[in-house]
UniProtKB/Swiss-Prot annotation:
EC numbers, comma separated: 2.5.1.75
GO BP term, pick one: tRNA modification
Keyword field contains Nucleus: no
Site (Interaction with substrate tRNA): 93, 115
Top-level division of the source organism's lineage: Bacteria
Protein name: tRNA dimethylallyltransferase
UniProt similarity note: Belongs to the IPP transferase family.
Organism: Shewanella baltica (strain OS155 / ATCC BAA-1091)
Keywords in alphabetical order: ATP-binding, Magnesium, Nucleotide-binding, Transferase, tRNA processing
Region annotation (Interaction with substrate tRNA) ranges: 27-30, 151-155, 232-237
Length: 296
């Protein structure tokens, strides 16, 4: 695990080449076909050195949830283990790691009809009245969700109307945790400025590699838009907006780099509270030796 631009892929490739391992990607951007440059997808040469599972498995117009990832990752892990190899999970989508390790609550999928029914009630009675409903059926969620947060309030009521159980009840029940021994590592530069510089350098390289042309091709399809999860990936949104004429080139670069730095900050926030985590410094000599020693 680690923030974007921290050197996860390079270390994973070194591990795969020198030991009996196979790589599974844990990245919500790498799953999409046609999104290669802006997602920092491993190059053809890198994939030849160490093939990655769970990349290029969805079209950008399709959704992919943490539950989807968990099911796919467990299937890949089982196959790798059956071959007598060790799976190495590499990426920066912390929600995927958490879902894989801890399991997920069995919340029902969205129901557009019930959601529309709730919205109609809110239009008639107001969200305060619906918050009172939630307090009656799920006081714990009502305490946590403000009446002025219609999205979360609607979802809590929707869950109850679909399942007959409160969100609090359902979130107390999770699927079984991962049935394997796991050794967890995070890699990051020691200094925040180093990471910020790496992010800016990598975005400049992406632009030279044709990132804007990649986004131009995605826009030209005609079936993609900025509300899709794929197009909300950092860099893609800013390039799309630049191509739409919303701001100039320098502003696009500034916004994309800033968004990527914010992503890295969120990733590090997750990692600092992550239990049983072994830390490695980006670019440090002996990282592979340290990693293998901890795995014994």
């Amino acid at each position: 695990m680690g923030p974007t631009a921290s050197g996860k892929t390079a270390l994973a490739l070194e591990l795969a080449e020198k030991h009996n391992c196979e790589i599974i990607s844990v990245d919500s951007a790498l799953i999409y076909r046609g999104m290669d440059i802006g997602s920092a997808k491993p190059s053809v040469d890198e994939l030849a050195r160490g093939p990655h599972r769970l990349i290029d498995i969805r079209d950008p117009r399709e959704s992919y949830s943490a539950a989807d990832f968990r099911a796919d990752a467990i299937a890949e892990i089982e196959q790798i283990v059956s071959m007598g190899k060790t799976p190495v999970l590499v990426g920066g989508t912390m929600m995927y790691f958490k879902a894989l390790l801890e399991g997920l609550s069995p919340l029902p999928s969205a129901d557009e009809a019930i959601r529309a029914e709730i919205q109609a009630e809110a239009d008639e009675k107001g969200w305060e009245a619906l918050h009172d409903q939630l307090r009656d059926i799920d006081p714990v969620s009502a305490e946590r969700i403000h009446p002025n947060d219609p999205q979360r309030l609607s979802r809590a009521l929707e869950v109850y109307r679909i399942s007959g159980k409160s969100m609090t009840e359902l979130t107390q029940t999770k699927s079984a945790p991962l049935p394997y021994d796991v050794v967890q590592f995070a890699i990051a530069p020691r200094e925040r400025k180093v990471l910020h510089d790496l992010i800016a350098q990598r975005f400049a390289i992406m632009l030279k590699q044709g990132f804007l042309e990649e986004v131009t091709e995605l826009k030209a399809r005609g079936d993609l838009h900025l509300d899709l999860p794929s197009m909300r990936c950092v860099g893609y949104r800013q390039c799309w907006q630049y191509l739409d004429g919303e701001f100039d080139y320098d502003t696009m670069v500034e916004k994309a780099v800033a968004a990527t730095r914010q992503l890295a900050k969120r990733q590090l926030t997750w990692l600092r509270s992550w239990p049983e985590l072994n830390w490695l410094e980006s670019g440090a000599e002996g990282n592979l030796v340290t990693l293998m020693r901890q795995c014994r």
